[in-house]
Regions:
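Active-site SXXK
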Residues: 64, 77-111, 271
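Acidic helix-start/capping segments at beta-turn-to-alpha-helix junctions
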Residues: 61-62, 104-125, 160-161, 226, ...
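Mid-domain, small-residue-enriched loop/turn segments at the edges of structured enzyme/sensor domains
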Residues: 53, 133, 153-206, 210-211
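Structured C-terminal helix/loop/strand segments within mature extracytoplasmic catalytic/sensor domains
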Residues: 23-49, 159-161, 204-234, 240, ...
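Conserved catalytic neighborhood of penicillin-recognizing serine enzymes
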Residues: 116-154, 162
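A short, well-structured edge-of-sheet supersecondary motif
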Residues: 38-71
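Extracytoplasmic
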Residues: 49-53, 71-73, 77-82, 106-108, ...
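Bacterial N-terminal signal peptides
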Residues: 5-16
Length: 315
């Protein structure tokens, strides 16, 4: 073989090797799969230790590659988590009102406090001056979100309409989530008219709002901001200070629930944990907090690492 021919052979071989290497995709069996399996295992342990019934739904909002569903289609008492749907219908009607549709509730519509509207667990409304204090629907929504004021929630139910709330939910394909009564309606509760939801449908609702499938962008941002008001709740209890959580907890005898969007850095996720038949309310609250903590640790870590686990340099 001549020197020229040998050189040409080597060049061709090198080019072929490079081309072959460029055609091969990167391996997909990364450590993130193993990390997620560890999270699933720890959450399963939490669920097993809990003495009642627990339902869990977690979905990655970045690309949807990670999700965890445990008893997620089971129907639970929603408790005050149903107020998510009331808040959503209010914002939906506000969009309609601003577009000129008559008979829809707007966020800036006024309400004059009437003590006849008062029900139990109304921490703010019970201290207002009758026939003097005027509030907007936005104010009522803030009371409903921040301190779970039941009178504020009931006034908003009257204003947006229970049937409209359920119609909105049904239109989204959510058949297990229903507003069946006002807050503190003991007689209705005894009849079995419980406000209900499933973890999976609560997650679907929150995901649709986050992705702009229900409200327009500005309205969705306002809705999330209002729901992110700091309040006593279970999802953020063991998360680092400063993590934004747009959530609504709920509490009834034997029941604890919490559903929301957790804005972990670069990797937000949506979570709903619902419990029932709980002999120990504090244990139920702790179970929700423990599940949220495990989920957060995964998404927070994945938000700052490569697919293979290296913590990436900050910009």
């Amino acid at each position: 073989m001549t020197k020229f021919a040998f050189t040409a052979f080597i060049v061709a071989a090198v080019i072929g090797i490079r081309a072959s290497g460029e055609d091969k995709p990167a391996p997909t069996d990364s450590g993130s799969d193993l990390l997620w399996k560890k999270v699933e295992s720890r959450i399963d342990e939490i669920a097993t230790r809990f003495d009642g019934v627990i339902g869990i739904a977690i979905v990655d909002l970045t690309d949807g590659q990670r999700s965890l569903l445990r008893n997620a289609d089971h129907v639970f008492p929603a408790a005050s988590s149903i107020k998510l749907a009331i808040l959503l219908e209010l914002y939906h009607q506000d969009e309609q009102a601003r577009a000129g549709t008559k008979g829809k509730a707007a966020l800036d519509d006024l309400y004059t406090f009437n003590p006849k509207d008062l029900v139990e667990d109304s921490r703010v409304m019970s201290g207002l001056s009758a026939s003097v204090t005027r509030l907007t629907n936005r104010d009522l929504a803030q009371f409903m979100v921040a301190v779970s004021d039941n009178t504020a929630a009931n006034v908003l139910i009257d204003r947006v309409g229970k049937d409209n709330v359920n119609g909105m939910l049904h239109g989204l394909g959510l058949t297990k989530t229903m507003l069946r009564r006002k807050m503190m309606d003991v007689a209705a509760a005894r009849r079995g008219d419980e406000n209900i939801a499933s973890p999976q449908e609560m997650v679907q609702l929150l995901e649709a709002i986050y992705k702009g499938k229900i409200l327009k962008t500005d309205s969705a941002k306002q809705w999330i901001k209002q729901l992110s008001t700091l309040k006593p709740s279970y999802i953020p209890r063991e998360l680092p200070d400063g993590v934004q959580v747009a959530n609504k907890p709920g509490e009834l005898e034997g029941v604890r629930t919490d559903s929301g969007i957790v804005f972990s850095a670069n990797r937000p996720f949506v979570i709903s944990v619902m419990t029932a038949y709980a002999s120990d309310g504090r244990a139920a609250e702790q179970a929700i907090s423990d599940v949220a903590r495990e989920a957060y640790h995964y998404f927070e870590m994945r938000g700052k690492t490569s697919e293979y686990g290296r913590i990436l340099p900050t910009p």
